[in-house]
């Protein structure tokens, strides 16, 4: 099997791609809000509760999702979370009440809270300590890219069909991203296309190796 050069950068690009979808999905409501409020009769006060439901669930979900990722494993846990927020995004289209939307936003926020912990976990797993700042910056590009791509895509979906269609499309992207992540992501120990040279480069820069080297140097002195 042919080895892939700079395999670690493929992995961080993958998590960046998932982060793009993550932020695209969460931004969709803000773009569609005027149309939703006009067609459903949802008031500004009710809309504020919808927004708050997401923020509360997202805030509470971050440490929980971090624990979930550490416990279950990065590959499976992040795929599950992406699938859940994809289904929750699509669920927006099935409800026209503020309480229904608030529930979907809360479910979406809780599962979307996995994105940053997953990105940090990928960077710490795949990169030596000296490159993690750059790796984290690369995957975090997805936050801005997702927020940037959402307005034209969501607006087009609304004009082409309806606000419900916009959430079906954006949610479908998350489901595809979940599958893509599950089948493409590999931990270094399972990555058959990772060269021995790059594997050594990554592992030699990990904390456990750096500590060992430091102890050896200290004992020699």
Model-derived features: positions:
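Juxtamembrane intracellular "pre-TM" segments in multi-pass secondary transporters
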Residues: 1-4, 187-221
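Extracytoplasmic
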Residues: 10-44
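Residue-level signature of mid-helix packing/kink "hotspots" within the transmembrane helices
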Residues: 27, 55-63, 147-148
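Helix-breaking motifs and short loop linkers at transmembrane-helix boundaries and internal kinks
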Residues: 41, 73, 94-100, 111, ...
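Conserved MFS/SLC helix-loop-helix module at the cytosolic interface between two early adjacent transmembrane helices
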Residues: 60-99
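Cytoplasmic helix-loop-helix junction between adjacent transmembrane helices
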Residues: 104-143
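Helix-loop-helix hairpin linking two adjacent transmembrane segments in secondary transporters
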Residues: 143-188
């Amino acid at each position: 099997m042919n080895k892939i050069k700079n395999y670690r950068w493929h992995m961080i690009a993958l998590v960046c791609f998932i982060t793009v979808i993550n932020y695209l999905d969460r931004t969709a409501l803000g773009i569609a809000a005027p149309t939703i409020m006009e067609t459903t009769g949802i008031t500004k006060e009710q809309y504020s509760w919808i927004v708050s439901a997401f923020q509360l669930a997202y805030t509470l979900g971050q440490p929980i999702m971090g624990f979930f990722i550490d416990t279950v494993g990065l590959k499976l846990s992040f795929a599950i979370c992406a699938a859940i927020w994809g289904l929750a995004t699509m669920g927006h289209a099935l409800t026209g009440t503020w309480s229904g939307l608030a529930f979907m936003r809360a479910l979406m926020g809780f599962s979307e809270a996995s994105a940053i912990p997953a990105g940090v976990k990928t960077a710490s797993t795949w990169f030596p300590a000296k490159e993690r700042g750059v790796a984290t910056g690369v995957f975090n590009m997805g936050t801005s890219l997702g927020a940037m791509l959402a307005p034209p895509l969501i607006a087009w979906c609304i004009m082409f069909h309806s606000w419900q269609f916009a959430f079906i499309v954006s949610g479908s992207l998350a489901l595809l991203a979940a599958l893509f992540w599950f089948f493409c992501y590999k931990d270094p120990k399972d990555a058959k296309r990772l060269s021995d040279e790059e594997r050594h480069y990554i592992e030699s820069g990990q904390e456990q190796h750096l500590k060992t080297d430091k102890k050896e140097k200290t004992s020699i002195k």
